[in-house]
Amino acid sequence: MQFIFFGTLFSGLLLVCAVTNDIEDASGETPGIVSQITEEQPHQRQKLYNWDYKDLGTIAFEDIPFPTLQPSQTIDQSENCPEGWIRYSDSCYWVETELLGFAKAERKCSEKQSTLFVANSIDEWEAIRGHSKDSFSSWIGLVRFSHYERSEQLPRWQTEGAVNPSKINWLIKPYSPLVNGWSQLANCAASYKSPASLETASYTYFYPCTYLFYSICERNSTIANSLH
């Protein structure tokens, strides 16, 4: 009888542990896992992270075919950027003033042989963000998709070598995804530029990817070659 009792008790404890490990909060996060990851977590990505629009036909995205790209044009640091583009270091930037969802914004950048803006340094982040439109948010190349971010806190830039995402100006600091708007339906990051001179009035936040915002494209020879 004692053997049966302890065996039943042990089985019950295993069942409780299994159920606890499967519990998720309303956002889809598993409590106690994401919070264990530090903001300095290594964040290595492949050279170009293509989010393949054919696989984005979900609540958050539209099924948008990838554009037909024109032959690559090398951008040399000594050359001027195309008319209307902004130069910083060896890259050119385009501030798109048509209101678009995230997927369409990225597609429009691709048509210009560019990606959504990826900051390689805080200096670049501040310089280019300063050209965005006052009182509006602009899409950038930063996402945190729920199906592959269960075990890490940081969102992903579209290209490698970018600044640690936790270092940019999130609305709530120190950075945590949930307090900065992230949910299963709000996966895409946008940068809001305040008309006020106070720096803390501008911020980065997660939004549903179907929201209509402006966007910032970035283009250089490395990006152009990677898109082909």
Curated annotation (Swiss-Prot):
Q: Which GO terms describe its biological process?
A: immune response
Q: What's the domain of life for this entry?
A: Eukaryota
| GO CC terms | external side of plasma membrane
Keywords linked to the UniProt accession: Disulfide bond, Glycoprotein, Lectin, Proteoglycan, Signal
Residues spanning the signal sequence: 1-18
Give me the disulphide-bonded residues: C109-C217, C188-C209
**SMART domains per record:** CLECT
Q: Which InterPro entries match?
A: C-type_lectin-like (IPR001304), C-type_lectin-like/link_sf (IPR016186), C-type_Lectin_Receptor_IMM (IPR051379), CTDL_fold (IPR016187)
Q: Which GO terms describe its molecular function?
A: carbohydrate binding; pattern recognition receptor activity
Q: Which residues are glycosylated?
A: S27, N220
Give the C-type lectin domain ranges.
Answer: 88-218
Q: Which Pfam families match?
A: Lectin_C
Q: Does the keyword Disulfide bond apply?
A: yes
Protein name, UniProt field: C-type lectin domain-containing protein 88
Species of origin: Caenorhabditis elegans
Recite the lineage of the species.
Eukaryota, Metazoa, Ecdysozoa, Nematoda, Chromadorea
State which gene encodes it: clec-88
